Design a protein with these regions (language model features):
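Internal acidic/polar
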Residues: 2, 91-123
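Arg/Lys-rich amphipathic alpha helix in sigma70-family domain 2
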Residues: 61-65, 75-96, 126, 189
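Short, charged helix-capping/linker segments at alpha-helix termini
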Residues: 13-22, 32-51, 169, 191-198
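C-terminal edge and immediately downstream basic/flexible tail or linker adjoining helix-turn-helix-like DNA-binding
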Residues: 11, 40, 93-99, 111, ...
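Structural recognition of an alpha-helix C-terminal capping motif at a helix-to-coil junction
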Residues: 33, 47-54, 67-79
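Sigma70-family region 2
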Residues: 13-14, 40-41, 53-68, 87-88
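DNA-recognition helix of helix-turn-helix
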Residues: 71, 78, 82, 133-136, ...
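Amphipathic, Lys/Arg- and hydrophobic-enriched alpha-helical face
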Residues: 24-42, 59, 137, 182, ...
Length: 198
């Protein structure tokens, strides 16, 4: 029987390096994907993921299984990503979002679009829609963006997201409501054409 994340982390706390390797292999890709959606830069997302795992490892002795491991890990990731976004805004105010999405490096990111052997045209339309949705999500205020990404892409429940964002569940629901309303406004042309569902 496979060990739970909590069991693995308790083993890491006890000095088991292989358990840490298992956690790293299990969560590296989802963590990098989440961080990419937050910071919109593959290299920065990779660096932040390494920093998250480094912080998890350094804090192993303080780990207490009072919350799910993923809640703890994504809280660290969210804080690092928000700090990175804030720092980046101050350094690169003149770079537009369009310029950052046109680099070859960013073209390598995974898209959450189902593959049912679509035609080239369907694939292009699907990529365009996904890009429009991600641009709209990226334009949200930081906390709203984090809440939407944790809810829709990481599929965390309200309680977990509230812990990650350090707010009450009712405050989170209000935050998500405002975020989805903002997305509806931003994506209205796509929604009105039945192109996308928010």
């Amino acid at each position: 029987m496979a060990r739970t994340d909590v069991q693995l982390m308790l083993d890491v706390k006890a000095g088991d390096e292989q358990s840490f390797e298992l956690l790293l292999r299990k969560y590296r890709t989802p963590l990098v994907n989440f961080l990419y959606r937050m910071v919109r830069n593959t290299a920065v997302a990779e660096d932040l993921a390494q920093e998250v795992f480094l912080r998890v490892y350094r804090a192993r002795q303080e780990y207490a299984p009072s919350a799910k491991f993923t809640t703890w890990m994504f809280r660290i990731a969210t804080n690092l990503a928000l700090n990175s976004v804030r720092d980046n805004r101050h350094r690169q105010m003149e770079i537009s979002m369009d310029q950052t999405t046109d680099t070859g490096e960013d073209e390598q990111r995974p898209l959450d679009v189902p593959d049912r052997a679509p035609s080239v045209e369907q694939e292009l339309v699907a990529r365009w829609r996904a890009e429009m949705i991600m641009k709209a999500i990226h334009a949200l205020p930081e906390k709203q963006r984090a809440a939407v990404l944790l809810h829709k892409y990481q599929e965390l429940d309200y309680d977990e997201i509230a812990r990650v964002l350090d707010c009450s569940e009712s405050a989170l629901k209000s935050l998500l409501f405002r975020a989805y309303e903002n997305l509806r406004v931003q994506l209205a042309p796509l929604v009105n054409n039945n192109s996308v569902r928010v």
